[in-house]
């Protein structure tokens, strides 16, 4: 898994840590623990990008968020399954949480 920093996917130099399914304690994968420098680079890139996003017209922002909503809906079951495995939730709980995430994006598009 890579970090997305400054518009680019960057390989992490951090050590790999286990992803454990809390429902059965099985290791389901590994992810790098990003370093402090990587975190700082991501924060710096976000701060640098903010003025441009701030000047982005509301309609353009809504289009970006609407695309996010579409992608979340297209991958609804996959997102729900990932939550179930990574958080030990039932699939129904995960589906509810995924649906709430989609609703939050919908609210954000209405606010803009």
In which residue ranges do the predicted regions lie?
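Terminal low-complexity tails and localization/encapsulation signals of metabolic enzymes
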Residues: 1-30, 63, 67
